[in-house]
Amino acid sequence: MSQNQEISKKEQYNLNKLQKRLRRNVGEAIADFNMIEEGDRIMVCLSGGKDSYTMLEILRNLQQSAPINFSLVAVNLDQKQPGFPEHVLPEYLETLGVEYKIVEENTYGIVKEKIPEGKTTCSLCSRLRRGILYRTATELGATKIALGHHRDDILQTLFLNMFYGGKMKGMPPKLMSDDGKHIVIRPLAYCREKDIQRFADAKAFPIIPCNLCGSQPNLQRQVIADMLRDWDKRYPGRIETMFSAMQNVVPSHLCDTNLFDFKGITHGSEVVNGGDLAFDREEIPLQPAGWQPEEDENQLDELRLNVVEVK
């Protein structure tokens, strides 16, 4: 066997292993939050970025082995940005044989008209985009709207709200729209951005950059993203631990009186879970909770079956 064949074989092995991990992450998120149910019609929002391409690919893959029936329709919003390659997504989706719809709305022109030069456009752009996608979901008869946000996006949102909004608020894996008509799901909620990036590179998706928001310097989200990436490099496992913390909230040890009845604690009350530990030194584990070295993780992947059950 030639050296090139050996490299190709190794690359394919690594790609299969990576895809299994992403399948497992997505399958677990779907099961944990009951994202997809029998007969669902999922509107997959496809921007042309690595995240949405990966989401569509993994959902298509799961669709073949899932114990329930659900359909997919890919939707792209053409916002009329200058230089947007209109042919890329239709050609890609037709090659896959995926049902799709391209929605054309000049939100770019509205944003440029309303937002002064130098100001960030993300807020208005996202509001306009959200309204159009909700309308499109109704027109298509979609029961769920799938967005491509991943674990890193969720953590970034948590820190953005803490640093700038004064709220302990993240980005939920599943939510009901404000009008109560649409359910939004984020199947990549458990997926790492670096895994998605590696998968997108290996699959050579035809990436379309966002020239409107991606080119804006000093965005608050970008500052947070850089901070988290730096933490991940310097303190391996910290990202995993922080995400685990979002899944293990103890309301009695925070300060929100809407979440816990502090006034109701009186003599004779039941013991609050872990309440008296406030006097003791915290026992901190030697390794971050929910984290294991890359090598161990890869070995575990080899032992797992390539089957993800969608409930």
From Swiss-Prot:
Describe cofactor binding as the record notes it: Binds 1 [4Fe-4S] cluster per subunit. The cluster is chelated by three Cys residues, the fourth Fe has a free coordination site that may bind a sulfur atom transferred from the persulfide of IscS.
* Pfam families noted in UniProt: ATP_bind_3
EC number(s) on file: 2.8.1.-
InterPro entries xref list: Rossmann-like_a/b/a_fold (IPR014729), TilS/TtcA_N (IPR011063), tRNA_Cyd_32_2_STrfase (IPR012089), tRNA_thiolation_TtcA_Ctu1 (IPR035107)
UniProt-annotated location(s) = Cytoplasm
Q: Report which reactions are catalysed by this protein.
A: cytidine(32) in tRNA + S-sulfanyl-L-cysteinyl-[cysteine desulfurase] + AH2 + ATP = 2-thiocytidine(32) in tRNA + L-cysteinyl-[cysteine desulfurase] + A + AMP + diphosphate + H(+)
Could you tell me the superkingdom of the organism this chain comes from? Answer: Bacteria
Q: Name one GO biological process term.
A: tRNA thio-modification
The molecular function terms in GO held by this entry are: 4 iron, 4 sulfur cluster binding; ATP binding; magnesium ion binding; sulfurtransferase activity; tRNA binding
Say where the protein is mainly found.
Answer: cytoplasm
Metabolic or biological pathway: tRNA modification
Q: List the disulfide bonds.
A: none
Q: Which NCBIfam families match?
A: PRK10696.1
Oligomeric state and interaction partners are given as: Homodimer.
- What HAMAP family does the annotation carry? TtcA
State the function annotated in the UniProt record.
Catalyzes the ATP-dependent 2-thiolation of cytidine in position 32 of tRNA, to form 2-thiocytidine (s(2)C32). The sulfur atoms are provided by the cysteine/cysteine desulfurase (IscS) system.
* Protein name per Swiss-Prot or TrEMBL: tRNA-cytidine(32) 2-sulfurtransferase
Which organism does this sequence originate in?
Escherichia coli (strain SMS-3-5 / SECEC)
Q: What is the lineage of its organism?
A: Bacteria, Pseudomonadati, Pseudomonadota, Gammaproteobacteria, Enterobacterales
